[in-house]
């Protein structure tokens, strides 16, 4: 039997706040703010990184790679940090060949991108 939640999925996406200018520290401080301000307790549970998080090119294996200057600890560590706060972590991808900002899209890379995100 399915249950109905009292609220729709609620969270935050980095684009409208930071646009191109995202980094590891901003995402961590946003997760901290969700907890400290009571947003998490109010039902906000998603922290989603939008466009501009990756390098401009895929690696030699065809995988998306986080921008090492913006995310020096990598996405796994950042995801673990967000999860440690009791929140859920999401990463933007695009179904086209490139994102709106010109970063690699997932077209014809869907399987490897899904694997990368899961890791």
Role assignments for model-derived ranges:
Residues 22-23:
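Structural helix-adjacent loops and short alpha-helical linkers that scaffold large soluble proteins
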Residues 26, 30-119:
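Aromatic-lined carbohydrate-binding/catalytic grooves of carbohydrate-active enzymes
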